[in-house]
Amino acid sequence: MGSDRTLKKQKMSVLQELKKITTIVADTGDFEAINIYKPTDATTNPSLILSASSMERYQPLVQKAVEYAKGKKGSVSEQVAEAMDYLCVLFGTEILKVVPGRVSTEIDARLSFDTKKSVEKALKLIALYKSLGVDKERILIKLASTWEGIKAAEILENEHGVHCNLTLLFSFAQAVACAEAGVTLISPFVGRILDWYVANTDTKKFEALKDPGVISVTNIYNYYKKFGYKTLVMGASFRNVGEIKALAGCDLLTISPALLKELENETESVVTYLSVSNAKLQDIEKITVDESRFRWLLNEDAMATDKLSEGIRKFAVDTVKLENLIKTYLK
């Protein structure tokens, strides 16, 4: 009996098994939670920064950002903008103290249709990181996968050596455009695709391997590896651990602390579903997308159109909430 207990103790958790074949990323701004699960990288977004900024233990960071902004001349709205940028960078800097890899910092969602301003904002964030002693190699600038966002990423990568993470990615057309732009990494969403199919079709439950979000990421991964694109695929937005396990082998998976905990508590063998060798065997046609084709294909995809616009709106709403929170400190 004692030996059975010893065996159970020695058996690796699903999270440990996954770490052998996939880079695990923590999807949170709560860097104390990140420290528990020892991921390689971390991702943040406006909603996660808002959530963390509302926690008592992170008030000193908010105060620090506000003090920084007060030292800048300008109107209240300009000071709020300064505080917002600095706060995102402060969170990123703290996160980098507990992860060995990179952190993703997101561009204001309200710039999703402005290439020039997205580039300017990204370079400002990179400069702020540099002022705090953080090298740009440890930063991924997150941009929405609009045509304008993808073009901004292309400029940042090619002209400034800034690595980009293209988020709110729901369609194959978006993925192809990102690969052709040569971005460092994409974050195709899984759970939000599932949400759309549950809400808009008669099927309310999907097995993990038949989950439309899992299928979407699998198709993108296979396409990238088949044709030798350097862009990495980081599955994101998970609703359950089944989706995560069905994407074992993906370049990276970014996972919330709640689901990381579930994976840590499970012990079972992990099957590698995604691999370069298997992708090379797939019968896939190579396509190319210019702006008009990108817009047409996106428009033809009701799910992707809905979810991209909804995602941008949600991040914009949470950005405004964070601005309002900062305003209370500036008064």
Swiss-Prot record:
One of its GO terms (cellular component) is nucleus. InterPro entries: Aldolase_TIM, TAL/FSA, Transaldolase_1, Transaldolase_AS. One of its GO terms (molecular function) is transaldolase activity. Coiled coil: none annotated. Its main location: cytoplasm. It catalyses: D-sedoheptulose 7-phosphate + D-glyceraldehyde 3-phosphate = D-erythrose 4-phosphate + beta-D-fructose 6-phosphate. The keyword Lyase does not apply. Transmembrane segments: none annotated. Its EC number is 2.2.1.2. Pathway: Carbohydrate degradation; pentose phosphate pathway; D-glyceraldehyde 3-phosphate and beta-D-fructose 6-phosphate from D-ribose 5-phosphate and D-xylulose 5-phosphate (non-oxidative stage): step 2/3. It is found in: Cytoplasm. PANTHER family: TRANSALDOLASE. Belongs to the transaldolase family. Type 1 subfamily. This is Probable transaldolase.
